[in-house]
């Protein structure tokens, strides 16, 4: 069987829940049997003693797992601004990035810096909005902030309703024309928009 390889990085402002998301991905893909936490010193990817002592990610780490017919390399990066150089080194090898945003804080200054770096390196990016259970605002107002401060083509995949398909369609003129004629958008077309950095 010919397997494809995908390199994906998890990037975020400090305390957004980035390593927790990485642990969850590894757990649900069968790579680990128990999810750890940075602050407990038992995160799978935070193996350095200094990371365990301080409760933060300092060094980029990788884990590999199989997802369907793809070999995936997951890179967990530091979120603290003091270790930005370590994070930026990983951008050169990424096929895709997951930018984690803390729902209770919204788009922070460092989030904007990360976004600009992802755009500079032309990395297709998924946004993962974390900690919405702690948010003091509605998902709609947070989405509005993200579209205003990051990109108007950031779309919530929470509901696949008519509004979702309209927001996806306006990301590309050709797709919009097709959508207005047929009222349909195929999954492959959405994948292509993401890969070509027209949809986030």
Spans of model-derived segments:
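P-loop NTPase catalytic nucleotide-binding module
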Residues: 1-16, 35, 103-200
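P-loop NTPase switch module centered on the Walker A-proximal segment
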Residues: 1-101, 107, 141, 150, ...
